[in-house]
Regions:
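Bacterial N-terminal signal peptides that target proteins for export
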Residues: 1-8
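Sterically constrained small-residue positions within well-ordered secondary structures
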Residues: 11-14, 61
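C-terminal segment of classical bacterial N-terminal signal peptides
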Residues: 13-21
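Aromatic- and Gly/Pro-enriched helix-to-coil junctions and flexible linker segments
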Residues: 23-158
Length: 158
């Protein structure tokens, strides 16, 4: 039993130090683009509409299993910072930040819960430890708009 606890402690220690290193080193090219290419490109790749085209004909594109194009750094950060502030965070979130309800794209981050959590942690590290904010540019309902101070916490290193 003692060996089991020692092993569990070692795993947690390595996981913690690995997450810290990832938080400092996560970049679009090295970490996010490979996940995107594997998990997201089929619906959000080069054949998808840009954000404005998608918003103009959302039902048509959703019926064709196409979301807004995010296959470049520039396209992806439009769904993080502006004009669709927080969209990536809201859709990929596991629900721990949204009252227990995961975002509608969380399920596509991996085929197992472990893979989904690993990929989510990579996205969170890339956005920044304090930048994973689910707010929008404008207030909606009882959720206030994102503040300049909160926007300043978004990192998204290329």
């Amino acid at each position: 039993m003692r060996k089991l606890w020692a092993a569990a402690g070692a795993v947690l220690w390595f996981a913690g130090t690995g997450a810290g290193a990832l938080a400092q080193d996560a970049t679009y090219r090295k970490d996010i683009k490979p996940i995107f290419d594997q998990k997201c490109a089929a619906c959000h790749g080069a054949a998808s509409p840009n954000l404005q085209e998608f918003l103009e004909n959302q039902k048509k594109f959703e019926a064709a299993m196409k979301g807004p194009r995010m296959d470049s750094y520039a396209d992806l950060i439009m769904l993080i910072g502006w004009p669709d502030t927080g969209a990536v965070m809201r859709r990929l979130d596991d629900g721990k930040n949204a009252g227990g309800k995961p975002g509608n794209m969380y399920q596509y981050l991996g085929s197992t819960d472990e893979e989904r959590q690993k990929n989510l942690l990579t996205f969170k590290a890339w956005v920044g430890p304090e930048g994973w904010i689910l707010k929008r540019w404008n207030a909606r309902g009882n959720v206030p708009a994102i503040t300049k101070e909160e926007l300043d916490k978004i990192r998204v290193k290329y």
